[in-house]
Amino acid sequence: FYLSITKETGKDHLGEFTKEFKKEKPSKVPVVYPYHFINENKQKIFSFGGISNLETIFCHEDYLVKYKSDRFGFNNPNEIWDNKKKDILLIGDSFTHGMCVFPENNIRSKIQKYSSDLNVLNLGIGGSGSLMQYAILKEYYNLVNPKKVLWIYYEENDIHDLIFEKKNH
């Protein structure tokens, strides 16, 4: 996670959070990607989601994108887990996670807005490949028991993520 100053505005978009990150119990955290634990730390057990129930700083593209993570660290409203009915479970990488788009514009929100009767759960996480996505699906499927699973695959980089995951299993 890095801090940068936007050339156009000269503003440090993330500066407001630097002090927060240094606190013993921060209320805002940078996004955490599970693949960091595989590659850099060689961890055998780790969370598939990010840090739960905290405001997560997600992206910096001349504007700051943040979301409040759910109880498992995914990009969902927390109360979605309380609804017994799960119509659609989304699984995928950063596109599914909602990279650089505000929560109201991510794929989960767009599908949810299509029909207010639908309950859509997003288990996408940036930097994940097919093996990690399958593991997430396997971990949460019985808890969620969705009517449908939409597995969103991006051929540009997901094959490379799969190769990385197979090599670092």
List each language-model region with its residue ranges.
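Soluble or luminal CAZymes and related metallo-dependent hydrolases
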Residues: 103, 129-132
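Conserved beta-strand elements of the Class I
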Residues: 87-91, 121, 149
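Membrane/wall-proximal cationic-aromatic binding patches
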Residues: 5-114
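Extracytoplasmic small-molecule ligand-binding "clamshell" domains
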Residues: 110, 117-118, 128
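A broad structural signal for alpha-helix termini and local helix breaks/kinks
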Residues: 115-116, 144
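Interaction-surface signature
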Residues: 1-46, 131-169
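Active-site micro-motifs of SAM-dependent methyltransferase domains
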Residues: 96-97, 127, 156
